[in-house]
Amino acid sequence: MSSRLLLQLLGFWLFLSQPCRARVSEEWMDQVIQVCGRGYARAWIEVCGASVGRLALSQEEPAPLARQATAEVVPSFINKDAEPFDMTLKCLPNLSEERKAALSEGRAPFPELQQHAPALSDSVVSLEGFKKTFHNQLGEAEDGGPPELKYLGSDAQSRKKRQSGALLSEQCCHIGCTRRSIAKLC
């Protein structure tokens, strides 16, 4: 019985003495690997899946400009400095200045507004107004993309990310690449 306990303790001690794979050395990240096809996919999952890529990027460079630009467009209920009905007022262009002031001050809306509120929420006009406002705040999107992605401004960004991923996979296959360069795509 005591030999069985000692064997289990020895196994437990060996298990604990193994180095943690979550800690990654700089040499491992900077090692040049040459992988193709499924091997590239496995390497990408290995680097990005364990959040190693995020740690490597946090040490290397600040956030890209595209992420900083999208951080400016925050709904008013999240952004504490914004006025509460900022987006609502922009989407209702036919509202008089007096009623807009009442909404922005937080006073009870006029009864006429309460009876038209369901119609405004379902109307295509208010949706188009919201899309135009959202589009203007994000900046110009490429005209070649589909209209759904045109207003979101993500078509050009996602296309660039896909193209850079394809170029990197070809480079990793033919020439070789570092795990750190794969981590930039995470």
From Swiss-Prot:
Q: List the disulfide bonds.
A: 36-173, 48-186, 172-177
Give a yes or no for keyword Protease in this entry: no
Q: Name one GO biological process term.
A: regulation of apoptotic process
* Record-linked InterPro entries: Insulin-like, Insulin-like_sf, Insulin_CS, Relaxin, Repro_Hormone_Insulin-like
Q: Name one GO cellular component term.
A: extracellular region
Which residues get modified to Pyrrolidone carboxylic acid?
163
Q: Supply the SMART domains for this chain.
A: IlGF
- Please list which residues make up the signal peptide: 1-22
User: Where is this gene product found?
Assistant: Secreted
Instruction: State the UniProt keywords alphabetically.
Output: Cleavage on pair of basic residues, Disulfide bond, Hormone, Pyrrolidone carboxylic acid, Secreted, Signal
Chief location bin: secreted
TM spans (from-to):
none
In terms of PROSITE patterns, this protein maps to: INSULIN
- The residues of the propeptide are 58-158
Q: How does it assemble?
A: Heterodimer of a B chain and an A chain linked by two disulfide bonds.
PANTHER family under this entry?
Answer: PRORELAXIN H2 (PTHR12004:SF13), RELAXIN (PTHR12004)
Q: Which family does it belong to?
A: Belongs to the insulin family.
Q: Protein name, please?
A: Prorelaxin 1
State the taxonomy lineage: Eukaryota, Metazoa, Chordata, Craniata, Vertebrata
Q: Which gene encodes it?
A: Rln1
